[in-house]
Design a protein with these regions (language model features):
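Exported/periplasmic cell-wall-interacting domains
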Residues: 95-182
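Functionally constrained cores in energy, signaling, and assembly domains
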Residues: 17, 43, 160
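Bacterial Sec-dependent signal peptides at the C-terminal "C-region" and cleavage site
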Residues: 3-5, 10-25, 29-30
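Gly/Pro-biased beta-strand-loop elements
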Residues: 26-135
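Generic detector of leucine side chains in alpha-helical contexts
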Residues: 8, 16, 22, 48-50, ...
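Hydrophobic alpha-helical segments, principally membrane-spanning helices and signal/leader peptides
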Residues: 2, 6, 70, 122-123, ...
């Protein structure tokens, strides 16, 4: 009985660590345009999904973590929440302290409008700032376990394993659409 339980536990652990990503063929990354792919991040699933921009076909999924365990929308600078909405990759930095960094255009017009409405409604302090420098990045060297254990540790960014961010960094051009949803 004990051997059976241990076996099932090991199968479960292996499935958990391999279920997000299946090897997929990527179209020629060297010729990718901003419309070749799009990304959907679902915070409640701790998942980043990559889709083919022309067919809408799912390509691959990656495990991710965020800032706060409260998966609500970013309200203001310093709340450690990840913003929701439709954004675009506007910058790529390599090397970076977290392997690679792809900055998104937060705050954009939609984010600023939500922020100003919340401020006018008194939901956030009148002196609050909207924040910025949000992106998708890796983890500190040798700390991929933070992703496996769903440890939300960022200041509002999206973090994945270093080998995954390197793959995404090499594949996704500036201008790629990134939708972040709860």
């Amino acid at each position: 009985m004990k051997k059976g339980s241990i076996f099932l536990m090991m199968v479960g652990i292996i499935a958990l660590h391999t279920s997000f990503r299946l090897p997929k063929y990527y179209p020629d990354a060297a010729h990718a345009t901003k419309d070749s792919y799009f990304v959907v991040v679902t915070k409640s699933k701790y998942e980043l999904q990559l889709f083919d921009g022309s067919t809408g076909e799912w390509i691959s999924s990656y495990p991710v973590v965020f800032g706060s365990k409260d998966l609500g929308d970013k309200m203001m600078q310093g709340d450690r929440k990840t913003p929701e909405g439709t954004f675009h990759i506007i910058a790529k930095k390599s090397p970076h302290k977290w392997s690679r960094f792809m900055g998104i255009d937060y705050p954009n017009a939609e984010s600023k409008e939500k922020f100003n409405i919340r401020k006018a409604q008194g939901l956030i302090p009148s002196n609050a700032k909207i924040g910025g420098e949000i992106g998708i990045h890796g983890v500190w060297p040798h700390e991929d376990y933070a992703i496996d254990q769903y440890q939300n540790w960022t200041e509002g960014c999206i973090s994945t394993k270093n080998n995954y961010i390197q793959e995404l960094f090499n594949l996704l051009p500036i201008g790629t659409t990134v939708t972040i949803q709860r």
